[in-house]
Curated annotation (Swiss-Prot):
The active site is at residues 146, 297. One of its GO terms (biological process) is galactose metabolic process. InterPro entries: Beta_galactosidase_C, Beta_galactosidase_Trimer, Class_I_gatase-like, Glyco_hydro_42, Glyco_hydro_42_N, Glyco_hydro_b, Glycoside_hydrolase_SF. This is Beta-galactosidase YesZ. Substrate binds at residues 107, 145, 346-349. It comes from Bacillus licheniformis (strain ATCC 14580 / DSM 13 / JCM 2505 / CCUG 7422 / NBRC 12200 / NCIMB 9375 / NCTC 10341 / NRRL NRS-1264 / Gibson 46).
């Protein structure tokens, strides 16, 4: 998988006759598509009847693709179990939180924990891996397809049994569970693990501990399913393994990718939401650090299903997406899908070719993206992304806690993307990292919206501050235990103890007309907030209006050579945005953050390092054009011309600049 940038598409040869297949492959080669993904929905083609397995068709397709200089990522087809596995067997099906049993006719309809499903999954994967695993054209494997895309936690009888076993392994005794969960509330106390319900229908809300733990249980079982598939494949193939995921789905990415070889994700962000696209790149670059990520699916024009559709991309945006993904650490930029499907629930979806074989509306943009790939490939292969000095922690566990306790519709993905977007617009080069990621090389660390911070993370972040880093914790951070209960020793538990503050109380500030002042700016305060008595720490932000007037909402605590800054509330509105930018600028300067560029909003700078020095890849994402100011002189590597000062870009344009070491 080394030595090139990939430009690919998801391909469904099993849906078309041989003439169409041959023409598709010829056209792919002609326009520069050099990799395809196949097989993820083809279980019934591979095993039309129980035990009658034949994957020869796909082996032949891989050979034919290779003959045309196109490489293949092969998938396991477990997202779409065939009718013979599900018909007449409701016990094998996914059951949602309403207690509704899923039927055949879509995808992800079976329970992935059912032992018979697991048995048949292992068997079909073994056959695929044995026949295809050593083919020269095979360069990678994708497990399943978008775990938990359409379904959340399953509450079938199989999962009930596994849930009880999971709880017993975690808590050892039922008394420990009762104590940890506080089941004395509403007389929920259990006498044995078998009595603990799943989060099915109830008159009101479930216990927070039960709801959160069930989601974590579900995530653990999906990771187990992935490990099981990977073990089968590795017995017959050395090709690297991935899974195409998304931060939208109910999986623990840190755990899931421990057993996989490279990270890949699917994204359908619009130009108006390009910050979500860039957030993904900055996150997935760090999920398997040091290894390029893949965009396994994105639309060449627009996404659609029978029930909805998105607006087509503006001309030029696809090129900007492709270049930014390569510049930010990606090795592949792939479309869903090559040829429009003539049937099924996604038949309206945008594609490279229409169902009748003509170029679709995004076709010219695909050609433009390919020209860009060819133009920047040699530079990307000779350089690598520069680690940021600023890090934002992403946590799937935090996502779970906010799903259990969303207050008034809070959504973790929205909150964390908005927080990230502020750094992006300020021109600060940033990494989005996982809870378990090392903090070496960072100077400024943000941990927003993480209700529960594990002791190991707090110890690591405190050591980071001791050695000179600045850790900004909050808002909505540290206020819950690992069991999703409230601390009883102090408001923010271990975080409070290392930050030098005393939490007086926590309450929602959104509708209490609360406001505060910090860094010379007065702004409304929002979200469920923590109010501090500064004590021996420095009060940086004070509440001036509302029930907690006169108390602190931002504090600063000296910690070794660095600092721990507590952000107890979220400044809101236009004034809040100004306050947050001042806070970030202040602590970035104090931490010695140098990776900051003077770039217009809507344009991104991706710094890379190579043998010749520092390279900036500058891309306009918003289609309005933009500019970046160089600190000194540079060379435009695409034109060979010297550049200095203010460098402008047209709509969706990109520049690749080698910075001079002599300013």
């Amino acid at each position: 998988m080394n030595g090139k940038l990939y430009h690919g598409a998801c391909f469904y040869p099993e849906l078309w006759d041989e003439d169409v297949l041959d023409e598709d492959i010829r056209m792919m080669e002609r326009i520069g598509i050099n990799v395809v993904r196949i097989g993820e929905f083809a279980w019934s083609r591979m095993e039309p009847e129980k035990g009658r397995i034949d994957v020869g068709f796909f082996a032949d397709v891989i050979r034919k693709l290779r003959d045309n200089k196109i490489e293949t990522v092969m998938c396991t087809p477990t997202a779409t179990p065939p009718i013979w596995l599900t018909h007449g067997h409701p016990e094998r099906m996914h059951v949602n939180e309403k207690g509704e049993t899923m039927g055949h006719g879509s995808r992800q309809h079976a329970c992935t924990n059912h032992p018979y499903f697991r048995e048949r999954a292992r068997l079909i994967i073994k056959h695929i891996a044995k026949e295809i695993g050593e083919l020269p054209g095979l360069i990678g494997w994708q497990l399943d397809n978008e775990f938990k895309c359409h379904v959340a936690e399953c509450i079938c009888e199989t999962c009930r049994t596994l849930w009880h076993k999971w709880l017993e392994d975690r808590y050892q005794t039922i008394d420990r569970l009762n104590e940890a969960w506080g089941t004395g509330v509403w007389s929920e106390t259990y006498q044995c693990f078998e009595q603990v319900p799943q989060p099915g229908p109830t008159p009101f809300l479930h216990n927070s501990s039960l709801r959160t733990m069930y989601q974590l249980f579900s995530m653990d079982k999906i990771s187990e399913f992935a490990r099981e598939q990977a073990e089968v494949i590795r017995a017959y193939s050395d090709a690297p393994i991935t899974h195409n995921s998304s931060v939208m789905f109910g999986v623990d990415h840190e755990d899931l990718f421990k057993s996989l070889d490279f990270a890949s994700f699917d994204t359908y962000a619009s130009q108006e939401n390009s910050q979500a696209f860039l957030f993904n790149c900055d996150l997935w670059r760090n999920i398997k650090k040091g290894r390029p990520f893949w965009i396994m699916e994105t639309s060449p024009s627009y996404s659609a299903s029978l029930e909805s559709y998105a607006a087509p991309h503006q001309n030029g945006y696809l090129k900007a997406e492709a270049v930014s993904s390569y510049a930010l650490g990606g090795a592949a930029f792939c479309y869903w899908l090559w040829r429009q499907q003539r049937a099924g629930s996604e038949q309206p979806h945008g594609s490279v070719l229409s169902a009748w074989g003509e170029p679709d509306v995004g076709y010219e943009n695909v050609l433009e993206a390919e020209r860009a790939r060819r133009e920047v490939e040699h530079i990307m292969l000779a350089t690598a992304p520069l680690q940021a000095e600023t890090a934002v922690v992403y946590s799937d566990r935090a996502k779970v806690f906010l799903k259990t306790e969303p207050h008034r519709g809070l959504h973790y993905r929205t909150l964390i993307t908005e927080f990230y977007d502020r750094l992006l617009k300020m021109g600060i080069h940033r990494d989005v990292i996982l809870e378990g990621s090392p903090l070496d090389g960072y100077k400024l660390l943000f941990t927003p919206f993480i209700h529960y911070l594990p002791p190991a993370f707090i110890k690591k972040a405190e050591a980071f501050a001791q050695s000179g880093g600045i850790w900004i914790a909050g808002p909505l951070t540290g206020g819950r235990t690992e069991h999703h209960t409230i601390h009883t020793d102090c408001g923010l538990g271990p975080l409070e103890k290392c930050s030098g503050v005393k939490t007086l109380f926590t309450f929602p500030m959104d509708e209490r007309n609360s406001s505060g002042t910090a860094f010379g700016v007065k702004a409304p305060l929002s979200l469920w907030s923590a109010v501090f008595e500064a004590g021996g720490t420095k009060a940086v932000g004070m509440i001036e209006k509302g029930p907690a007037s006169g108390k602190a909402f931002i504090t600063e605590h000296k910690c070794g050579k660095g600092k721990i800054v507590m952000l107890g509330s979220m400044p809101a509105g236009e004034a809040g945005d100004i306050m947050m930018k001042k806070l970030i600028s202040h602590y970035a300067e104090e931490a010695g953050v140098e990776q900051k560029t003077d770039v217009t909003p809507g344009t991104v700078v991706a710094p890379r390092k190579g043998a010749d020095g520092l390279v900036w890849v500058v891309i306009n994402m918003d289609g309005k054009g933009g500019a970046v100011t160089l600190d000194g002189n540079g060379t435009d590597l695409l034109s060979g011309r010297p550049v200095t000062g203010r460098v402008t870009l047209g709509p969706h344009d990109y520049r690749v600049i080698l910075l001079s070491e002599n300013k």
